[in-house]
């Protein structure tokens, strides 16, 4: 019966987070999503010495359960994959909570008239990301994992995403060093502009009107920032957050992942544009969070 799955006297899945559910069956046992991330980390994120850094953002009420499972399983996977895991945890910050809405999309209030707050979405974890001591960070949903028979594709594409990121970041850093030196020609600035437009997909219509000094300010602003490369999959059902060219407040056009909540669904043209999207991002990102000076 379904109650045997979610009730306390059964598997208690109704009270457990997705990361702790029994997820994939193997000949030698069953793995949770958390364990699958241990395996993935060993396959594509191990350093030269075999060290694998994995960070989980979890809810306060479930943290002890995650820590207990890691303590029970980490030795097993270290022995199996020749890895040395460094597992850390953080919790979504209450300061990122957002106002809950009712069925009419109006702020929800409790019986005392106080606004009810709820945890924000994935974007609220950006502070947790920024707190990490790392150069490159792979970001995934806890349950966005596949069984071993499908992991080869996962590993290949993770390496591809990271390779694209490192290649773009290396070039951006070289250009920033050039701009810092003060020794550059207008032709070199045009080369940097082409990189920003063609590789980073960021455009500005009035660039030809800018003097070189203003061009440098603009280029430095676009290059000296965190960088991310996002994996996309084809839409086969309801469209999710996908890649769009967005108009920014500073007059530039850049590639962004837009969710349905960011689209004016009352505008037929914009709604149709969103619904015709061919790809979406299943929270599969690789991010570079240090600047060109290592900060």
Regions found by a protein language model. Give the residues of each.
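Beta-strand-dominated extracellular/periplasmic modules and repeats
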Residues: 207-217, 225-294
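Histidine-anchored nucleotide/phosphate-binding helix
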Residues: 30-52, 71-77
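Long, K/E/R/D-enriched contiguous segments that form extended
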Residues: 140-141, 149-238, 244, 250
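Extended, domain-scale alpha-helical bundle/helix-rich regions
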Residues: 30-33, 42-46, 62, 107-179
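Short helix/loop capping segments that flank catalytic or ligand/cofactor-binding pockets
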Residues: 65-67, 97-99, 127-128, 137-140, ...
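Short, conserved secondary-structure transition motifs
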Residues: 58-65, 89-102
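Beta-sheet entry/capping signal
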Residues: 51-56, 84-88, 114, 134-138, ...
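Short, small-residue-biased leader/transition segments that mark boundaries at the very start
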Residues: 2-6
């Amino acid at each position: 019966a379904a109650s045997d799955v979610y009730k306390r006297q059964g598997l208690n899945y109704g009270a457990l987070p997705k990361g702790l559910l029994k997820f994939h069956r193997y000949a030698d046992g069953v793995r949770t999503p958390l364990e699958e991330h241990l395996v993935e980390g060993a396959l594509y994120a191990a350093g030269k010495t075999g060290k694998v850094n994995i960070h989980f953002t979890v809810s306060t009420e479930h943290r002890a359960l995650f820590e207990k499972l890691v303590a029970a399983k980490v030795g097993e996977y270290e022995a199996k994959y020749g890895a040395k895991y460094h597992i850390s945890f953080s919790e979504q910050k209450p300061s990122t909570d957002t106002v809950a809405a009712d069925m009419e999309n109006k702020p929800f209030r409790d019986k005392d008239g106080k606004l009810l707050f709820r945890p924000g979405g994935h974007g609220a974890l950006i502070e947790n990301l920024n707190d990490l001591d790392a150069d490159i960070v792979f970001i995934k949903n806890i349950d966005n994992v596949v069984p071993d028979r499908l992991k080869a594709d996962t590993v290949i594409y993770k390496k591809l995403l990271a390779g694209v990121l490192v290649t773009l970041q290396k070039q951006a850093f070289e250009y920033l060093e050039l701009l810092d030196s003060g020794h550059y020609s207008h032709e070199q600035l045009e080369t940097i502009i082409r990189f920003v437009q063609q590789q980073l997909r960021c455009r500005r219509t009035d660039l030809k009107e800018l003097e070189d000094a203003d061009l440098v300010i603009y280029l430095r602003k676009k290059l000296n920032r965190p960088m991310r490369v996002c994996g996309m999959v084809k839409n086969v059902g309801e469209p999710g957050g996908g890649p769009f060219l967005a108009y920014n407040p500073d007059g530039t056009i850049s590639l962004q992942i837009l969710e349905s909540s960011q689209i004016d669904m009352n505008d037929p043209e914009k709604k149709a544009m969103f619904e015709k999207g061919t790809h979406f991002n299943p929270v599969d990102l690789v991010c570079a969070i240090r600047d060109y000076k290592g900060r």
